[in-house]
């Protein structure tokens, strides 16, 4: 195996008893890249992070950090910094002592001052974790992870315990700090919005496997399979029949991309591609709606009883019970067997 990235995972598997937590995982993270491991609970993403950190050892496969094979290497010698979900600060140590833990004594005081300034906590060095807010504790955890100048920063759902009203701002602030340092980051999350807003690439995991690793734009527009298509964003799946370069559906004919050879397929149409035009003679009916501020998600029943979802700006409110014409954008669509 060639260890050319800052993190390389090659054929890594991990089993706990009869449970296959990670199965033949393949991933390479380049220097300065921000990659998110995205998946539902129990998919193996945290186990994979712990394997990279050295808290677990793989049953098979190879792991590299900073172009060095780290199988069997102790966590403290892997050149990784980790921010845990619960931050794992030492309650009996001050902020400064937490940040300086593991830093050589001769460099400690200056390094602590530098990092507390970086995370906006100058003057907090003498406080204890219980005297800080959740957001401040998170900054301390990040400073501690950065203190030994790691090659890679690992984040295990670090914003899950933050108040939802503060989560986005804290997320953007800490991600901004990491980007300003040119850090290589691997984030574990089950939050699609978080992954899409922060990551350069997203590795989607399911049942212990990485099913697709791609940029957010590619992942949304060209998902590898039907499950991934539905997991990374809302989607309507209509039955369709391939006819040459087109596919015939209840909503008309569409150009096809990514054909798979089948004649009967499921056709992915994202909600934002379905316009609604109020029309008393329309063949479809709005049967429900969900207001989400900037957008409204409409549940629409077609003439044959099939229901689809349309995402429209909240400036175009359509009352429930309205008859409408569903007007899809005639963009190329993805199809799945």
Where are these regions (language model features)?
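ATPase nucleotide-binding modules
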Residues: 224-287, 299-317
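Helix-to-loop junction immediately C-terminal to a conserved catalytic motif
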Residues: 53
């Amino acid at each position: 195996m060639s260890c050319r990235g800052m993190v390389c995972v090659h054929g890594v598997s991990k089993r706990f008893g009869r449970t296959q937590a990670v199965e033949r995982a393949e991933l390479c993270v380049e220097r300065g890249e921000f990659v998110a491991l995205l998946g539902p609970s129990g998919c193996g993403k945290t186990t994979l992070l712990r394997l990279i950190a050295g808290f677990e050892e793989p049953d098979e496969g190879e792991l590299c950090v900073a172009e060095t094979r780290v199988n069997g290497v102790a966590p403290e010698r892997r050149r990784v910094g980790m921010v845990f979900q619960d931050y794992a600060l030492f309650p009996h140590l001050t902020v400064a002592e937490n940040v300086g833990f593991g830093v050589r004594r001769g460099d400690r005081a200056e390094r602590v001052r530098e990092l507390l300034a970086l995370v906006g906590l100058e003057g907090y060095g003498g406080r204890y974790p219980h005297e800080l807010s959740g957001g401040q504790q998170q900054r301390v955890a990040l400073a501690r992870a950065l203190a030994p100048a790691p090659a890679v920063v690992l984040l295990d759902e670090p914003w899950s315990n933050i108040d939802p009203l503060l989560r986005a701002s804290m997320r953007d602030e800490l991600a901004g700090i990491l980007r300003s340092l040119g850090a290589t980051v691997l984030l574990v999350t089950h939050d699609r919005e978080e992954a899409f807003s922060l990551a350069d690439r997203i590795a989607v995991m399911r049942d212990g496997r990485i099913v697709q690793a791609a940029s957010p734009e590619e992942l949304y527009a060209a998902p590898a399979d039907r499950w991934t298509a539905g997991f990374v964003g809302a989607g309507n799946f209509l039955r369709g029949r391939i006819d040459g370069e087109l596919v015939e559906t209840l909503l008309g004919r569409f150009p096809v991309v990514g054909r798979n050879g089948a004649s009967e397929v499921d056709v992915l149409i994202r909600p934002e591609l379905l316009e609604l035009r109020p029309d008393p003679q329309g063949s479809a009916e709005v049967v429900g709606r969900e207001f989400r501020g900037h957008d409204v998600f409409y549940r629409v029943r077609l003439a044959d009883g099939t229901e689809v979802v349309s995402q429209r700006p909240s400036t175009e409110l359509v009352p429930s019970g309205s008859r409408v014409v569903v007007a899809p954008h005639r963009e190329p669509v993805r199809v799945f067997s």
